[in-house]
Amino acid sequence: MKKIPVILSGGTGTRLWPLSRKELPKQFLGVASEKTMIQETVLRLRYMDFSDPIVVCNESYTSIVYEQLRDIQVDSPYVIFEPERRNSGPAVASAAFLAESFDTDSVIVVFPSDHVIRDAKNLAKAVEEGCRLAGLDKMVTLGVKPTYPETGYGYMEIYPESSDNTCYKLKTFVEKPDEKTATALIQKGNYFWSSGIFIFKAKVFLSELEKYSNEIYKNMKKAFSKATRKDHCLRLESESFKKIPFCSIDHAVMEYTDKGMVVPLDAGWSDIGSWHALWDYQDKDSNNNVLLGDVLALDTKESYILGKNRLVVGVGLKDIVIVETEDVVLVANKNRVQDVKKIVEELERKKHPATN
């Protein structure tokens, strides 16, 4: 039974704007370390017994993907290029069709390319348990115990019965709740954050996809069968692909399947999906600030300040995010940074070049 890692790398990372842009989104940036996020994701695979990875990304990122993987001595990954963004459901479907063509009993382990994990060895233990369950035809997701009412994550309710606390049966998904709802979910105690890491047999996923999201299944099957192939590179056929609905893996399958299981992940995980999440992840000074670049802060607490090109000075600030780049300065309340995505949408509507 092959175990094949699938790296999802097609997102645009709009909530980390203005650092993350369409042409160079956060997975290709060194946001949390000197290496880029996709490089860190692939390097974590060293702790696990995997076959060569499958990377799924947009066609526009072709050269970036190959260049960054070559830099870490990954010379021959399988790469699937999507003509357009369609979210994680179709992306995983394309990888599942490819993995099934290698080995009809293969297990795929899906990793977003833009998350950070401090403890790769604990991740490997959770993945090993997930692969055991996947071998029993279960559909597994790794869940993280919530530490605060984050509104940018999906939440998963579990049936609390477990013989050894290594896995739980999945009950329901809750899509990105508001703060009041998130607080209530945490207090109940039987909810996890969805880490975005999924483990299942390719054929089991495709069977469930055909059952619950047939439009994705049938059109991806056509796009895959008509794909252009060269060496380890596969370009999905555009006409069929464009008929595929935009859909997350949660909405496509995980909300409906009766095979869902949750394996707890305690490995210092963060999806770095917002400036608040990045502030939460990084080391702080004695005033709980993250100060990066040419920055001076006076009487400032609980803030994130990044200066890329100029001196940035903060005086008397609390819970503030300041991000200075060559062409944009973002100033936001740290508790409102989820709304950065709305700013990007408005700029895109106005066709402003700052989104590129």
What are these regions (language model features)?
Residues M1-I7, T14-K22, G30-P112, V116-K121, ...:
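Conserved N-terminal catalytic core of the sugar/cofactor nucleotidyltransferase
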Residues M1-K2, K203-N356:
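Left-handed beta-helix
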Residues I7-S9, V56, V109-P112, T141-K145, ...:
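Short beta-strand segments
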Residues F28, I38, A95, D114, ...:
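Residue-level signal for inorganic ion chemistry
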Residues I54, I108, I197-F198, S270, ...:
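A residue-level structural signature of the nucleotidyltransferase/glycosyltransferase Rossmann-like core
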Residues V74-E161, I199-F200, L206-S213:
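Conserved beta-loop-beta/alpha segment of the NTase-like Rossmann-fold superfamily
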Residues I158-F192:
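A short, charged helix-loop
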Residues Y191-A202:
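Short loop-to-beta-strand entry elements in the cores of soluble alpha/beta enzymes
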